[in-house]
Amino acid sequence: MSDSVILALGIAAFTVIVLVLVAIILFAKSKLVDSGDITIDINDDPEKAITLPAGGKLLGALASKGIFVSSACGGGGSCGQCIVKVKNGGGEILPTELSHINKREAKEGYRLACQVNVKGNMEVELPEEIFGVKKWECTVISNDNKATFIKELKLAIPEGEEVPFRAGGYIQIEAEPHVVNYKDFDIPEEYHEDWDKYDLWRYVSKVDEHIIRAYSMASYPEEKGIIMLNVRIATPPPRQPDAPPGQMSSYIWSLKAGDKVTISGPFGEFFAKETDAEMVFIGGGAGMAPMRSHIFDQLKRLHSKRKMSFWYGARSKREIFYQEDFDQLQAENPNFVWHVALSDALPEDNWTGYTGFIHNVLYENYLKNHEAPEDCEYYMCGPPVMNAAVIKMLKDLGVEDENILLDDFGG
């Protein structure tokens, strides 16, 4: 057999092998890779059904059709907010979901939308309020320091639009890939001490993907045309100086007047109960945001006559903000009082008010001698350590879970 014939046979055999492999790959792709259009039926309502190409996650599929399910972690599976009921399709529940969904809920079909693969037709059940959620491109009005590590971001809603939120609600804010240099932050001189002490100016936040985070609103519904947030910068802890800084908080701190920002909402469940019970608000740090929203709404919009008090914890005097606003509310409303406790007052503060941690101050100066602390409603938002301490104290006083309302975002 000549060399040319052998060569031709070799080429032919190789070609056949390649074609067979391509056929196998295409067959596997047809079975494993999502393709074609699928339909997601929603709430057994034909008008709400959506049709779209297969692929991706349920959270993104819904968002692509203007249905925005809350997800504070941006779809990472860590916040557990995007719980929906999948009645048909979606595959088996994943291990990543089981830390947020118990066995009973899993059996009933509850899933994290950010973890559900969209491979075929599905039937899902969504809360009706989700259909009122929208997106807006807002303009930054101002972004000013209110404390050493807290800025007040004030956004203008597009003209003619409104965000129909309730006090205690929150929005989600989005950011595209970006780089933020902390040395470029505009921070008043009075707050430089800690920034210099820990050399926080050296940090850089680099984000390579689109991110979404949730923030409670400090504004209340009567403040038309604006959204106001209190944002604490998430700097690396002193014991872990090489840890990356918070992505979204760094981005928000870099914003300047005139910048455009995309938000979606409104979302929320941290709403005031419609009762006559006494209201006790407890806050710390950026947990001020929903406290301000609730208290302003109760006193300025609803003109509530319910007995209420606000207990706020701060490190030192320069970390107190909105003081004039709350002083004025206290002067105008005999049913409202507010107190601040400093945990680390400075000598120059000349502080004569309460000192120590806010849960101890609240207990020693009010609840210890209260006739029926278990009958009050407690609204709180602050650092996790504060929240845990307050909840333990309330439990020891016999307060039931239904009267302890916690916003986890503000700390």
Swiss-Prot record:
Cofactor note: Binds 1 [2Fe-2S] cluster.
Any single GO CC term annotated in Swiss-Prot or TrEMBL for this entry: plasma membrane
Subcellular location: Cell inner membrane
Topology of the protein relative to the lipid bilayer: Single-pass membrane protein
Superkingdom classification of source: Bacteria
Primary localization class, coarse: membrane
2Fe-2S ferredoxin-type domain segment(s): 36-130
Reactions catalysed, as given in the entry: a ubiquinone + n Na(+)(in) + NADH + H(+) = a ubiquinol + n Na(+)(out) + NAD(+)
Record InterPro entries: 2Fe-2S_ferredoxin-like_sf, 2Fe-2S_ferredoxin-type, Beta-grasp_dom_sf, Cbr1-like_FAD-bd_dom, FAD-bd_FR_type, Flavoprot_Pyr_Nucl_cyt_Rdtase, FNR_nucleotide-bd, NqrF
Residue span(s) of domain FAD-binding FR-type: 133-273
Cofactor: [2Fe-2S] cluster; FAD
The enzyme's E.C. designation: 7.2.1.1
PROSITE patterns linked to this entry: 2FE2S_FER_2, FAD_FR
Keywords, ordered alphabetically: 2Fe-2S, Cell inner membrane, Cell membrane, FAD, Flavoprotein, Ion transport, Iron, Iron-sulfur, Membrane, Metal-binding, NAD, Sodium, Sodium transport, Translocase, Transmembrane, Transmembrane helix, Transport, Ubiquinone
GO BP terms, alphabetized: sodium ion transport
Transmembrane segments: 5-25
Molecular function terms from GO: 2 iron, 2 sulfur cluster binding; electron transfer activity; metal ion binding; oxidoreductase activity, acting on NAD(P)H, quinone or similar compound as acceptor
Alphabetized NCBIfam families for the sequence: nqrF
Similarity comment text for this entry: Belongs to the NqrF family.
Subunit structure: Composed of six subunits; NqrA, NqrB, NqrC, NqrD, NqrE and NqrF.
Name of this protein: Na(+)-translocating NADH-quinone reductase subunit F
Organism the protein comes from: Haemophilus influenzae (strain ATCC 51907 / DSM 11121 / KW20 / Rd)
UniProt gene name: nqrF
